[in-house]
């Protein structure tokens, strides 16, 4: 107010305000300032009584309070272009999909399967079932080998017995052959027991 006192028209305004106090109060202004005194309804109704363009600024601030992120209308065209460019870049990123089938490289380490590794794994996988089957075959094969060995030992003993010059040697071999023949029936007996064990029990056949 001190600055207004230096003006020449201040005294006239003061007299007009004193002469017509009712007009000043109905307008809600005193000396160019808005008096609210807790009366918010004047702002809500959109009273245009404010001066110096403060009403427009208030409306903009109220509108901006809802969306403070919105750019100014002049900048919308400029802002839309970078957004459009950003949307063009995002489909490029979406085209790259994560897949376990693709090879990965971490600082020079390649996790891609090579043909050699795949072949080794296939051979190992093929060897595993073969080794599982071999124990069954091995059991039968060992029995067959024992029988063949026993027969092979018996057959050479027979030709040795035929020459008459080697009768003393043949007599020494005969007890050995007799022992082998005795061992052969024992092998056959064990074979029969194993065969009976290898045949499934009736309860196992039902399953």
Curated annotation (Swiss-Prot):
Localization: Cytoplasm, Cytoskeleton; Cell membrane
Stretches with biased composition (Basic and acidic residues): 78-90, 131-154, 163-182
Low complexity: bias regions: 1-25, 63-77, 100-109
Gene Ontology annotations of biological process type: actin filament organization; blood vessel lumenization; cartilage development; central nervous system development; neural retina development
Keyword Ribonucleoprotein (UniProt): no
Keywords: Cell membrane, Cytoplasm, Cytoskeleton, Lipoprotein, Membrane, Myristate
Coiled coil: none
Mutant phenotype after disruption: Morpholino knockdown of the protein results in reduced head and eye size, a ventrally curved body, and enlarged brain vesicles. In the craniofacial cartilage, the ceratobranchial arches are reduced. Formation of ceratohyal cartilage is disrupted with an abnormal angle relative to wild-type. Morphogenesis of the developing neural tube is abnormal, with a smaller angle between the walls of the hindbrain neuroepithelium at 24 hours post-fertilization (hpf) and in some cases a partial opening in the dorsal region. Some deformation of the midbrain walls is also found.
GO molecular function: actin filament binding; calmodulin binding
Region named Effector domain involved in lipid-binding: 93-116
Bilayer topology term: Lipid-anchor
Primary location group: cytoplasm
Cellular component terms per the entry's GO annotation: cytoplasm; cytoskeleton; plasma membrane
Family: Belongs to the MARCKS family.
Function recorded in the entry: Involved in the control of cell movement by regulating actin cytoskeleton homeostasis and filopodium and lamellipodium formation.
Name this protein carries in UniProt: MARCKS-related protein 1-B
UniProt organism field: Danio rerio (Zebrafish)
């Amino acid at each position: 107010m001190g600055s207004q006192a230096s003006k020449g028209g201040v005294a006239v305004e003061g007299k007009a305000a004193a002469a017509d106090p009712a007009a000043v109060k109905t307008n809600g202004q005193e000396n160019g300032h808005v008096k609210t005194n807790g009366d918010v309804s004047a702002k809500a109704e959109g009273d245009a009584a404010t001066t110096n363009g403060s009403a427009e600024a208030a409306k903009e601030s109220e509108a901006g309070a809802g969306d403070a992120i919105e750019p100014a209308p002049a900048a919308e065209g400029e802002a839309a272009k970078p957004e459009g460019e950003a949307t063009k870049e995002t489909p490029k990123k979406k085209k790259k999909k994560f897949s376990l089938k693709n090879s990965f490289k971490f600082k020079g380490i390649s996790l891609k399967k090579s043909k050699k590794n795949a072949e080794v794994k296939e051979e190992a996988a093929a060897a595993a079932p073969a080794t599982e089957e071999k124990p069954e075959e091995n059991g039968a094969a060992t029995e067959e080998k024992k029988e063949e060995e026993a027969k092979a030992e018996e057959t050479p003993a027979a030709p040795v017995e035929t020459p008459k010059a080697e009768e003393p040697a043949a007599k020494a071999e005969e007890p050995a052959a007799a022992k082998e023949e005795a061992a052969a029936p024992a092998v056959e007996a064990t074979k029969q027991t194993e065969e009976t064990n290898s045949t499934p029990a009736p309860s196992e056949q039902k399953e």
